[in-house]
Structures are given as C-alpha cells and as structure tokens.
Amino acid sequence: MKMKNIAAVAMAGCMAASLAACGGSASSAASSAASTEAATSEAAEATGTSANGFTVQLGPNPETLDPALNSAIDGANTIITTFEPLLLIDENNEVVPGQADLPEVSEDGLTWTFTMKDGLKWSDGSDLTAKDFEYSFKRLACPDTAAPYAETVVGMIDGYEDAIGNPDADGNTTTDPDWDTLNVHASEDGKTLTVQLAYPCSYFDKLCAFAAMSPVQQATVEANGDAWCTQPDTFVCNGPYMITDWVPSERIVLSKNPNYKGGWDSSKIVSDTITLLLLEDSSAAYAAYNSGEAQLIKDVPTDEIPSLTKAEDGGRLLC
C-alpha cells in the first residue's frame, strides 16, 4: 500500500468534511472550486474509485439524526451534511450566510432580524420559510423535546424561562411550560425571522450556525414522532445531501439534494453520493479500506501502525 494513496484519500475526505462543516460557502468557494475538483480527481485516480461518489467510515449506528437531540460527533457529521441552519461558519471561522443573509442587529444587541434567501426548499420539494425556523427554535426550548443543547443555544432568547416553566433552584417547574413564549417570530410572509434576546449575546450569530439550530419540518415530525429521522422516506432535510438508503449497522447513503439552495456553492458539491459505513471496529474498517470498499477510515488497528509507518515513497502515517 502506498502512502500517496492514503494521502489522496484523506484529501478527499477532508474536502467532504470542509464542505459540510466549515469551508466552501458561496462567499468563499470561487477561489477554491478549481483546486477542489482537481484534488477530487487525483484522489479518485489514486484509489481507483469514481469521482462521483466515495465511501467513508462513520462509526456506530447514530443514536439520533434529529438536530435538536443529537450530542454525538458521528451524528453531527451526518447532520451538518444533510441540514443547514440560518448561518454557516467558513474555513476562516467567520460567520457567512446559510439559509438566511447575515442578520441585522439592533444597537442594543437585543433584536436580531434574519432575511431568508429566496426559493428555499425542503428535500421533498415543499417550501421552507422563516416559519420553519420559528417552529424549530421553539421546539428546541420545549422541555418535552429534552434537547441537550437547548439552554446553550436558545437560553439567551427572551421568554426562555417561561418556555421551560420557570424552574426553581432544584429544577422543578413553577409554571406551566409554554414554548410559544420564546420571543422568536416569523413574518406573515415567511420571509423574515426576528429573534429578541433577553440580554446581549455577541456570539449569537455563531450559535445560529450550530447544528442544533437547523430547521426540522413540523408536519413530518408531528406525523412520525421520534421515528421521523430513522427512515429515508421520512427524513426530510434541507442541506446539500439527503439520505436515500439506510441499512442499520451497515451503511447510510447520502445523495445530492436536488432541491438544495443555501450557503454552499453548488460547484463545491462534487460528489453525487457519500456512503457512510457503520463500522466501529478498527480491524473491520481497515479491511474495508484494503479491499477498496472504503476510501477513508477514522483509525487503524494498533498492530498495523508499524507497517504503515514503513510505507513506500517516504510517506508517513496519516491518522
């Protein structure tokens, strides 16, 4: 095995990660689109795989792919590829537009107004508006949702304490929780979302790029309960990729979302499919890599490290 192959594969994997996690937004993609395409082709040539799709090791079965409920890295890696929040973080750790333009913020730092991009769609082709974000933010705050990051991402919004029932020092509610008290409101035409904070939060824009702040489709969630995010047919999303196949304990297949519109430059979305192998065992993952089934794995068996560090071409282990 040549280290140049491993390097090329790692490059392809890093590009996929940068597309979904921090790089390649429409505001920064123009200068790197050509180099990305060339790197993808190089990786495909080195590994003998098609540039139109690749396979990576994800890890175990995700505990959940509900943006509001997830707290695991493996789940987040899938969520940030299939969902998109109001804003994104680019490769320079700068906030850039996602589903909305950069917000207008009042002088006192309390009122944040987001203007949605035109023509936004869910993966099922239905319209996505600011009303979907209003629902999703309020769902995050609802105690029944039990979102692990709720207080972190929406706790500074006016009305949050009322939304969660004004808990006492022991965490017991003192009033009936009412998620409608969260001061987040979509305009009647669904074009703008206004968020009123209880106190200034200078980094609220970065919170609006957090995976948990991604929108979920109310009709789908209410019709399917917790199962909405466990099957391709009910997994309605708004990111650059969508789930088209899911075999538990085996694989999840992501395909380009034909209805996607948002912060990513479409020229950066170069892979038609991304197959996520649900493998936790490093030996099984390494075998999948050696057989050509996977082009990127997270780790290798410890006893294989000495042989890999002695690879040809003066390469060094990439892990």
PLM feature spans:
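Bacterial lipoprotein signal-peptidase II cleavage site
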Residues: 22-33
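Ligand-site clamp/hinge motif
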Residues: 259-307
